């Protein structure tokens, strides 16, 4: 059926819907009958495919080769255990992959769009997945079209359909009839799922949902979802590939040295195998992904939903946050304070319906307004539903007025024209009602409403109005200007002149209680907070001073002043500009680019359709979850579920903490592996027996190491985390300092391991290997406490991370099980140990931790003395 060829009446009849929309009961029946309004995703890998994919890794292939060599050397028990560990690793990798998919799905559901629909005669907001055929959707600028539909009422609607047609220009829509058969791009009385509303408003009858939409027909092409890796994951992949090559080269050298030392070929091969197993950080990739996933889940619980994992890494580098004022730094709870009308400033309670000026102002406040209050809850823009309260306090309801007076035309609010206008028939005459910024409206007025009626406006009147506007603004109040025009002309932005000035309405939107603390935390963290707002410059600066963004010596500029600046002038002033007022979308992009040119990582917040380009341009685009348009959410890499600036600072702290934990986890794993490598190479150079069986090292790497590594990844943010400067994004994890630390700590553990090996050799090779294995395992378990933080354990507290204690206990229990349970001995090539040997192992294993902690204490005391 071609819905676009049917008249509006025919469409409503076929869908069985009236102007009051579907009933809730009918909508629920249709939802059960036709299913949710979602696109079917492209086929995901099955669990078996994911499992088999684990064996395609180069490092795993090296382990398989090691197992085969072990088998040919006659060590069947070790071969079985190596293969068992490889399979266990594949199972863990599969479980982790499936859990990661589930985590991402839950994050997607948190950021999925809502839709405004008319049901039971009332406008309500519902999740887009619950939209059904026959629903009447209310579309406004900034909305994402969530279903296909026929336009029933059109108010200057413009839509971007590039996702379907490839055409990037906006399409003017209408509610007229089309009789001929036309291509999709010419169906101007229809809207399609996946499109973006860029201007205007419309009521649409839904004709297709889910896979029955135009975009659903090509869903199979769109949903071949490719898994994207973050820069850190890609960096670790490259590191693993390079490591595999280095392992092969060093193993070959060790094999050659062993042969030169007249070692048997199979023994030499076992040396090479031991080295390969020692060097491979089997759990590294999985653990890093787990730590990132835990970080994003924690952020989601704290109202910051990460849409792109790259944002987690970038958050730790943020040096500038460009934030909206309204709702982000303020409470977004608008209440009318004072009203300037008839030349005097009055309270809302003093409005009188018998006064013509007051009555027309109330008309403008209530009729020239798209919001409503249902069951005490405001629906729409907070500024707009605040304007409904004065009429309600007079004992009337906005619907009482709207049911009698019908809107004839409208020009929706636009950030360029900074005003909204509608046409109504009042007292038998057509009137245009308008509201907006004073600089957009006052110059359009040629008359003013007074107690004695309407008269021409004078320059003295304008001076009084501007003076009152400044007084309100200096007190941190948001001010809207109201005017009207009696005319039969068609409503248009270009012809909106000849207005009668009605008055100013000031509203207060107090700063959030936590904003001042959050701004102070940002500054302490080396982050420059910048306020960007569409509000008046004086109002914005007053709020910025209250919360600490604007300091002595700082500058505030308007969008027009910014336009007048050259790039070089902006470059020289940008670090002093703390407030941008009355800005355009182009201004926002220019501000982001100017900061980025100076090498900064920039976060930009936004909620409107016109904010999308700036959100994409910023390193981290942050959309508002409550007031944000679906267009802005689609462009952002992070969505704030509470629209709160303080949540951004929490997310920055969490981003820094995730990166720090990953870095500490990698240090723990690689320093432990370096200890094993040093031990094997040392033994090879001195023609000593192989200090470890391959199965020993696999046991350490996969079982006892994994638990402390995950515990390190769960370390809480330290108190001084926000006292540090933002991380340089160009600086990788494997810095010279990191490498030196890794090698030194690895060498310390290797020394005590080889000491235990020498002592064991006095008995026999099996005892030596067992003592080396036990010492290395226990030393690495102790080492988990060292890698929790750069600070000493005395400063952070032994019990501040209970997971690290549990990980140590579990790892030690696993080691004890292998050492003390006889039937495990042949599987792990374990010799029985005496009580003295076990005591000596415990003492040796603890030495590296004592030394490392002692160094940390000395460094802390030196820093304190400075």
What spans do the regions from the language model cover?
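C-terminal catalytic subdomain
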Residues: 752
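Membrane-water interface at loop-to-transmembrane-helix junctions
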Residues: 728-747, 766-767
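Alpha-helical scaffolds flanking conserved acidic
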Residues: 361, 767-768
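Conserved cytosolic headpiece of P-type ATPases
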Residues: 1-723, 733-734, 747, 758, ...
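Generic alpha-helical transmembrane segments
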Residues: 704, 749, 770-784
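Long hydrophobic segments that form regular secondary structure
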Residues: 757, 763-764
